[in-house]
């Protein structure tokens, strides 16, 4: 019997009553019989953004298989048609091999293409929404396959219209890419490459540097970690909390609670809606949660390389992960009156 601990990058979670792997087409054929009253159905990708309860899951978990990516001309763009089960990083690597560099800043992000669309991934100045063509979705309420455009996805920070929605399943989608190099739009990446912002660099240069940055933070899947880098922090869901957005008034109160000058441009950023995005990692550190912190006797800990990652040090349970995450959210809330929102999807759990 398959368990969530076997199919998630965090490596926690109980047994699954029924586990199915199938292609998107096979899923559409079988779906009406799966989505029946009283039966729980969960469709997963790479399990890199999922935390499941230790209790047995009584329903069906479906993992969609990948299929070949189809590349075709579409006017000024080249259209990549991709199945939901395709590894995101494999897609990045494949697009680079074909001379399309736009996805290179998002190298090394674990999980699948379907998860990337639902999660609205972005990294180092690039975002999946900026190149989205369409999303193919199975609607369990109507048993039909429908197409979502960019507006239909209602993208927000690390969220979309399809995140945490169990009756709509992403089957695949299209990205519209242009060949050639892409400008470096993120300060940390520019500094690492030793170039000015806006400089055009080859996708391979960008990819190599992004993978190195992620390895230094312990934010790469184990199979992508370059030789010589630590792999002890790879059992995680990446960043466990999203960076909170606060009002400018709240930011003024926050300044009085932290050391003078601490709220600099490296930890705050103006949001496109007029709020201020604050580094969640900064809030954890200012609340006393240092890298490597753990509750006594627990195998769940904060990564020794990145303050925002909760890692499984070996044999951790979902209960231990939630215990640590709960302690963090309560402490940050008491100290700064800021509620941290978890980034991963919870199954049978809540903070």
Curated annotation (Swiss-Prot):
Gene Ontology molecular function: any one: UDP-N-acetylmuramate dehydrogenase activity
Cofactor: FAD
One Gene Ontology cellular component: cytosol
Any GO BP annotation: cell division
Pathway: Cell wall biogenesis; peptidoglycan biosynthesis
Active site per UniProt: 158, 239, 343
EC primary class: oxidoreductase
FAD-binding PCMH-type domain boundaries: 11-213
Keywords per UniProt: Cell cycle, Cell division, Cell shape, Cell wall biogenesis/degradation, Cytoplasm, FAD, Flavoprotein, NADP, Oxidoreductase, Peptidoglycan synthesis
Principal subcellular localisation of the protein: cytoplasm
Coiled-coil boundaries: none
EC code(s) of this entry: 1.3.1.98
Catalyzed reactions: UDP-N-acetyl-alpha-D-muramate + NADP(+) = UDP-N-acetyl-3-O-(1-carboxyvinyl)-alpha-D-glucosamine + NADPH + H(+)
InterPro entries (UniProt xref): FAD-bd_PCMH (IPR016166), FAD-bd_PCMH-like_sf (IPR036318), FAD-bd_PCMH_sub1 (IPR016167), FAD-bd_PCMH_sub2 (IPR016169), MurB (IPR003170), MurB_C (IPR011601), MurB_C_sf (IPR036635), Oxid_FAD_bind_N (IPR006094)
Cellular compartments annotated: Cytoplasm
Family: Belongs to the MurB family.
Free-text function comment from the UniProt entry: Cell wall formation.
Descriptive protein name: UDP-N-acetylenolpyruvoylglucosamine reductase
Name of the gene: murB
């Amino acid at each position: 019997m398959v368990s969530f601990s076997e199919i998630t990058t965090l490596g926690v979670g109980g047994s699954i009553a029924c586990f199915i792997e199938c292609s998107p087409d096979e899923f559409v054929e079988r779906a009406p019989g799966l989505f029946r009253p009283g039966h729980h159905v969960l469709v997963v990708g790479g399990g890199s953004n999922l935390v499941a309860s230790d209790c047995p899951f009584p329903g069906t978990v479906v993992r969609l298989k990948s299929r070949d990516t189809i590349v075709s001309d579409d006017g000024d763009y080249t259209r990549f048609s991709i199945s939901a089960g395709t590894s995101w990083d494999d897609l990045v690597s494949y697009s680079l091999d074909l001379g399309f560099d736009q996805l290179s800043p998002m190298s090394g992000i674990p999980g699948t293409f379907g998860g990337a669309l639902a999660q609205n991934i972005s990294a180092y100045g690039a975002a999946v929404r900026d190149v989205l063509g369409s999303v193919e979705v199975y609607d369990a309420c109507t048993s039909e396959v429908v197409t979502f455009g960019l507006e239909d996805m209602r993208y927000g920070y690390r969220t979309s219209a399809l995140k945490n929605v169990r009756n709509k399943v992403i089957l695949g989608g299209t990205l519209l890419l242009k060949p050639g190099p892409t400008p470096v739009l993120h300060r940390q990446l520019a500094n690492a490459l030793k170039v000015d912002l806006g400089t055009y660099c080859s996708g391979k240069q960008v990819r190599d540097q992004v993978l190195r940055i992620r390895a230094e933070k312990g934010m790469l899947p184990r199979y992508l970690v370059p030789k010589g880098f630590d792999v002890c922090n790879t059992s995680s869901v990446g960043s466990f909390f999203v960076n909170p957005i606060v009002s400018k008034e709240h930011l003024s109160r926050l300044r009085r609670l932290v050391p003078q000058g601490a709220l600099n441009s490296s930890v705050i950023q103006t949001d496109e809606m007029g709020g201020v995005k604050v580094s969640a990692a900064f809030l954890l550190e200012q609340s006393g949660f240092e890298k490597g912190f753990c509750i006594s006797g627990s195998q769940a800990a904060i990564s020794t390389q990145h303050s925002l990652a909760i890692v499984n040090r070996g044999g951790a349970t979902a209960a231990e992960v939630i215990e640590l995450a709960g302690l963090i959210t309560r402490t940050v809330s008491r100290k700064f009156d800021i509620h941290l929102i978890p980034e991963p999807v919870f199954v049978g759990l809540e903070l």
